[in-house]
Amino acid sequence: MKIKVLLIGIVLTQQLHAQSYQKMHNKAIVVDTHNDILMQAADKGIVFDRDLTGITYSDLARWKKGGLDVQVFSVYCDGDKKNAYAYANREMDSLDAVVARNPDKIVKVFSYADLLKAVKQHKIAAMFGVEGGHMIEDDLGKLDSLYKRGARYLTLTHNIAPSWATSAADEASPNPSKGGALDSSRRKGLTDFGKQVVQRMNQLGMLIDVSHAGDQTFWDIIKATTKPIIASHSSVYSLVPHRRNLKDDQIKAIAKNGGVIQVNFNPGFIDSSFGKKETAFLTKYAAEYDSLMKTGKLEWYSMDYLYKKYAAETNTMRPPLSMLIEHIEYIIKLVDVDYVGLGSDFDGINITPQQLDDVTTYPLITKALVDKGYSKKDITKILGGNFLRVLKANEVK
């Protein structure tokens, strides 16, 4: 009898705990600053107001199930793609079509006030983040146009950078085939035009995103901007020394600037052992990978195909959720809780951490933070409050 009572007590405690973190999650404004599903919408005709379970990590119904309130949709194409600006507009069109079909579920927002109104109406607040300065094609007028369509941040450089800002890949790799390389005549950092881009973004109230930026570009941005900046999807270099992650002095500089670091879920950025696992996997299936590439598939889609085909093997490579939490905690301990948030990179990454199987699983992050002893106030900041502060601070008054 005593054992039965004890078991009932344990079950009730677990249920109360689940209700507690779920209630906290539901009351917070949950923001994800980086999701790449628009790339698949443009490339493959994916329509994400349908059930895409097993195909993508995201769709409209699953965002709602995961308690997501604000999604920044990445507008991205490779840096060497022709007509990048036209492609950006195609991606934007795909979101606009979903919004038009589902006005009761999702709305495009252009301001902090719009966002709060959408959340109050229980609609997903959607905005764009343009991933890569190459998409403005060296034209400030095109930057203005993308802003008018709802782009509220610009990632100044992707791996293959524009002519006016060097990327982390540029500054780290001497080999163009590795995703970026510097011409011997080209200086690192922002050019004069790059500084004009920063100035124009400050004038518009458009957030400057330093994810993918090279070190010199980062410091040039810090010097040039008059507004708080973001890293829309980056993690911690001291934990995983990957060129895409932020070093301690950069994290401190973002905090001093009043900005925010949105932690990326990419296993390669949060687990120092993942690179070796991935290399071994791709070596094992090299012939199949090469065959896929020869059919004209992009690298991302070729890898995605293999990871899904060999899902059982892929699953053993996934880092635990606790590793993502370690990156969040590292930033908190280094600079305080006011400067960290979530930038998942869902549908831009091929593998996710364990438990984070798709966008329905955001509440498990809240649970992990509750289990770590963080207060409701601090968790609310991490889930979205910190990003909202930066968004509001950038708006032109």
PLM segments and residue spans:
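N-terminal hydrophobic targeting/anchoring segments and the immediately downstream early-domain regions
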Residues: Q19-S184, P241-K397
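Conserved active-site beta-strand-loop modules that form the wall/rim of enzyme catalytic pockets
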Residues: G9, K227-P228, G259-V260
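Divalent metal-binding pocket/active-site signature
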Residues: R149-I230, S235-R244
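Bacterial Sec-dependent N-terminal signal peptides
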Residues: M1-M24
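Alpha-helical transmembrane segments and their juxtamembrane interfaces
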Residues: L12-Q14, K44, W219, R243
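Basic side chains
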Residues: K2-K4, R152, R200, H233, ...
